[in-house]
Amino acid sequence: VAGTPIVEQLVNDIAGVVNQPIEEVAFILGDPAFFGQEIVAHLTKFAENLGAKASIYRQLNPLGTGHAIMCAASILEGPTVVAYADTLIRADLSLDPTADAVIWVKEVEQPEAFGVVQLNEENTIVNLVEKPKEFVSDLAVIGIYYFKEIEVLKAALQEVVKQSLQEGEEYQINQGILAMMEQGKVFKAGKVNAWMDCGNPEVTLQTNAAMLQFKKEEGETLVDPSAIMENSTLIPPCFVGKGARISNSTIGPGVSIGEGTIIENCELQNSLIQNQDRKSVV
């Protein structure tokens, strides 16, 4: 979205605000048939550009977030951020030194659709409930977590994944977190200024528009100098990638056009056009 792959945008955002060097980035990918060597090479280079080592792990069976984390069990050591790859944020991810872990949350209008946390007066999380049928809290878990010693979560999840699953059940990170809370580990809540989901096409388009606006306000260059505009109007904010060619078209707002893409005789708003694509008379 907004010219950057979602997972790269997420890691960049985290790296930019945690104020600590990142030594290693572990990517949990699915079946190689869908996440092949080209993707692995791209992610490896991306991590190296951050000055970090890249590690690739596979979750071949979609058995939940807790199971996904345990796919990378061999490197679960020390201070670690866990983040879901369909989430983008704007936040100060400063870490509370008194906390064993931090869960970032955002107020939402429909908390029954999310996992939510309850806090006490000291901003300590005292309960975590997944998709409550009755009102518990409006602070939704956004899918970014910090663990001072992720070995503790690993040990908890090792016990979780020993359990047999009933049909439709999964191993969830929440099970490990609740076990840690029972051990007396202190979880604090972190707040985000903006939380943007990329879990389905509709919300991804909304996220694209929001990220374009953020980048515009932050002064980022959104139109590559090599892009060619012929008899066309660009209504910002829009992203236009390297080598793209736009002719006889009106583009924007909220449009991202990938590298090498050709747009002809089109009117586009709130759209995502991938690299090396071609659109005519839309």
Segments from the language model and where they lie:
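Conserved core of the sugar-phosphate nucleotidyltransferase
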Residues: L88-S164
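Short coil/turn connectors at secondary-structure junctions
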Residues: A52, L76-P79, T98-A101, G184-K185
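Conserved beta-strand segments of alpha/beta enzyme cores
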Residues: K53-S55, T124, V186-K188
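Short glycine-rich anion-binding loops that position phosphate/pyrophosphate groups of nucleotides
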Residues: P32, N61-P62, A85-L88, V108, ...
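Conserved N-terminal catalytic core of the sugar/cofactor nucleotidyltransferase
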Residues: T4-A83, L93
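Left-handed beta-helix
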Residues: E159-V282
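Structural beta-sheet core signal
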Residues: A26-F27, V82, A101-W104, A189
